[in-house]
């Protein structure tokens, strides 16, 4: 992302009554906040954030830049407040997704379900081990 264009695009943009954070600051804060997540969620979240920021580093459309940063800033607030476990998407938000975004969301959902199942299996193994001792 071109820094001049970003700052020009974001300069007056507000979201939830706050100025949008510059991309690098936002990226670092998200990764720092991920350190508080359980291991598997942290790994998956870090990888996803890195990929998304890499994929969007060359965008030059001001509306896309503001939308991208606003969405990630909302995510940062959600995980900072511990609301990530109960988060849901509204039907309005789902309808606004492009076909590519819908596929990406579906893949993310499958990965999180797999992660959840793996965690349950590990937990049951731990319980069995503790019962044997």
From Swiss-Prot:
Pfam families: Complex1_LYR_2
Coiled-coil region list: none
Keywords recorded for this protein, A-Z: Chaperone, Mitochondrion, Transit peptide
Transit peptide region: 1-12
GO CC annotation terms, alphabetical: mitochondrial intermembrane space; mitochondrial matrix; mitochondrion
Location within or outside the cell: Mitochondrion; Mitochondrion intermembrane space; Mitochondrion matrix
Major site of localization recorded for this protein: mitochondrion
Gene Ontology biological process terms in this record: carbon utilization; mitochondrial respiratory chain complex II assembly; regulation of gluconeogenesis; succinate metabolic process
Keyword Chaperone applies: yes
CDD domains: Complex1_LYR_SDHAF3_LYRM10
Superkingdom of the source species: Eukaryota
Self-association state and partner proteins as the record states: Interacts with SDH2 within an SDH1-SDH2 subcomplex.
Family: Belongs to the complex I LYR family. SDHAF3 subfamily.
Other comments on record: Present with 195 molecules/cell in log phase SD medium.
Role of this protein: Plays an essential role in the assembly of succinate dehydrogenase (SDH), an enzyme complex (also referred to as respiratory complex II) that is a component of both the tricarboxylic acid (TCA) cycle and the mitochondrial electron transport chain, and which couples the oxidation of succinate to fumarate with the reduction of ubiquinone (coenzyme Q) to ubiquinol. Promotes maturation of the iron-sulfur protein subunit SDH2 of the SDH catalytic dimer, protecting it from the deleterious effects of oxidants. Acts together with SDHAF1 (SDH6).
Protein name per Swiss-Prot or TrEMBL: Succinate dehydrogenase assembly factor 3, mitochondrial
Gene that this sequence comes from: SDH7
């Amino acid at each position: 992302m071109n820094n001049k264009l970003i700052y020009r695009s974001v300069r007056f943009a507000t979201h939830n009554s706050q100025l949008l954070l510059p991309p690098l600051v936002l990226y670092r804060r998200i990764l720092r906040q991920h350190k508080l997540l359980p291991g598997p969620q942290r790994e998956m979240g870090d990888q996803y954030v890195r990929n998304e920021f890499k994929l969007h580093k060359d965008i030059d459309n001001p509306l896309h830049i503001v939308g991208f940063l606003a969405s990630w800033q909302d995510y940062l607030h959600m995980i900072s407040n511990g609301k990530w476990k109960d988060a849901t998407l509204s039907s309005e938000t789902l309808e606004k997704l492009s076909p590519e975004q819908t596929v990406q969301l579906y893949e993310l959902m499958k990965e999180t379900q797999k992660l959840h199942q793996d965690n349950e299996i590990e937990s049951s193994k731990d319980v069995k081990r503790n019962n044997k001792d």
